[in-house]
């Protein structure tokens, strides 16, 4: 990897372009990420996606929240975290209990009761 200061970066591209160019054609220069000089701090080029998140995460000093709003927000955040943790834990190790053995089928009586009239028994059975 080649580390260059920002001012040397422009000179290097021009030099590479002149070395690689043939008369009548443009030369291909491999892209090089410029590095910051010693006096600068930070990164020269940040991804647009990073800028998007940085802009959304900035805290505006003009906007103030009351104590009640802060406590309510804190309560809702903690509540949602606890709720998520409970739903995650409830899925682990929970099994439907095995039911007890089912009772047997009822047994058919083998003997008829002697108190029933025989004519009535013929109609029933």
Swiss-Prot record:
Q: Which InterPro entries match?
A: SMR11/SMR16
Q: Which UniProt keywords apply?
A: Cell cycle, Protein kinase inhibitor
Is-annotated flag, keyword Ion transport?
no
Q: Name one molecular function that GO assigns to this entry.
A: protein kinase inhibitor activity
- Keyword Phosphoprotein annotated: no
Q: What does this protein do?
A: Probable cyclin-dependent protein kinase (CDK) inhibitor that functions as a repressor of mitosis in the endoreduplication cell cycle.
Name-wise, this protein is: Cyclin-dependent protein kinase inhibitor SMR16
Give the source species. Answer: Arabidopsis thaliana
